[in-house]
From Swiss-Prot:
Name of the protein in its database record: Homeobox protein Hox-C5a
Residue span of region Disordered: 112-148
Compositionally biased tracts (Low complexity): 135-148
Keyword set, alphabetical order: Developmental protein, DNA-binding, Homeobox, Nucleus, Transcription, Transcription regulation
CDD domains: homeodomain (cd00086)
Subcellular location, principal: nucleus
Organism from which the protein derives: Danio rerio (Zebrafish)
Subcellular location: Nucleus
Gene: hoxc5a
Disulfide bonds: none
One annotated Gene Ontology cellular component of this protein: nucleus
Motif Antp-type hexapeptide per record, residues: 150-155
Family listed: Belongs to the Antp homeobox family.
InterPro entries: Antp_homeobox (IPR050296), HD (IPR001356), HD_metazoa (IPR020479), Homeobox_antennapedia (IPR017995), Homeobox_Antennapedia_CS (IPR001827), Homeobox_CS (IPR017970), Homeodomain-like_sf (IPR009057)
Known function: Sequence-specific transcription factor which is part of a developmental regulatory system that provides cells with specific positional identities on the anterior-posterior axis.
Amino acid sequence: MSSYVGKSFSKQTQDASSCRMHTFDNYGAHSEFHESNYAYEGLDLGGSFSSQIPTNSLRREAINTTDRARSSAAVQRTQSCSALGSRSFVSTHGYNPLSHGLLSQKAEGNMEVMEKPSGKSSRRYQNGDYFSDKQQTNSTQRQNQSQPQIYPWMTKLHMSHESDGKRSRTSYTRYQTLELEKEFHFNRYLTRRRRIEIANNLCLNERQIKIWFQNRRMKWKKDSKLKVKGGL
């Protein structure tokens, strides 16, 4: 009985030792056994390359196919939307902004673009030119300012003929002529101070007073000569 127990115990110890030697001493078998645990996407962290897992590759292929299908569907949608938008815009307004630019005009007719009624101004695009209401109003205002209104009392009685080289003839009122005749009766030659005083009183200038006295003296001399000849 004791011999049987001893043999069985010796067999167990041998099996355990062989198992330990297999797990810890055989390094190559251990690395091969745990090879899949240390591999990350086909790259072995220990320095060796391992093959990819077939399940991961299948999943990636399926994901790639779905992404491609989604991208192709999105591209088709955008193309269809752009085509529809361009057709509708061309049909409604008569020109295609995608092919000819936003400001291109159809050769068959003219286009008029008006802003909202609440807008400040309206624009018209006709024959390649812009016309705005603001510009028209500004031009009219400038013309009105450049041409001031002339009232009748602002006009002169005798217009000047400066283009002909002649000066305008001054017209005197009845009151002015009477005052000048009184002054000429007392004094036929005026000083400059007296001439300025009369000009201020009669609302005339010094030159007009001087010319009137010169003409009056010439007339007086002519009359005096005629009287002398008639007396002889």
